[in-house]
A protein has these predicted regions:
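Alpha-helical transmembrane segments in inner-membrane proteins
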Residues: 1-166
């Protein structure tokens, strides 16, 4: 029971350390199937950027498209969270960072960029959390918060500034 509580607390703080080889095999299989399926939604998401009326005029079923995008994002997020815990700020900060770096809203560019940038940032944060010299390891969330919080704050302040200027 004590080990289960410890495992739950570590999972709740976000950790890659408790994922076993068998779990990783299942994770890779699921991601190998689901990520390419999410790439099939790129055109749909680009159409949704145009607004509902334009997208509808171009033949997009808005309700169905939203359901597919939300379901796809939800399932992928749920799988990652089930394995690694809620690693906060990666999912919020990385898309905004990529949008700022590549200066585009085109999902043909953003989807692969976010995929690779998110993986790279997760690995870097995990390495920093396990830096030699620490007693044990910091939760990955403590490092992702240092990166993600300023990004999310800048997005919120920029949006607020734009609203005030209008």
């Amino acid at each position: 029971v004590e080990e289960d509580i410890r495992a739950y607390v570590i999972w709740g703080l976000g950790s890659f350390a408790r994922v076993s080889g068998n779990q990783m095999t299942l994770f890779v299989i699921l991601m190998t199937i689901l990520i390419p399926l999410s790439f099939l939604l790129i055109k749909t998401m680009n159409l949704m950027l145009l607004g509902d009326s334009y997208a509808r005029n171009l033949g997009l079923n808005i309700k169905r498209a939203r359901l597919l995008v939300i379901t796809s994002a939800g399932v992928l997020t749920a799988i990652v969270t089930a394995y690694c815990g809620p690693i906060i700020f990666l999912g919020l900060a990385v898309p905004h960072l990529c949008r700022a770096i590549f200066q585009t809203s085109d999902h043909r560019i953003l989807m692969p960029a976010v995929l690779f940038a998110g993986a790279a940032l997760a690995l870097i944060c995990n390495l920093i959390a396990r830096m030699p010299g620490f007693e044990g390891a910091l939760p990955v969330n403590s490092v992702t918060a240092l990166v993600g919080a300023p990004v999310v704050a800048s997005v919120l302040f920029r949006k607020r500034k734009n609203e005030l200027n209008e």
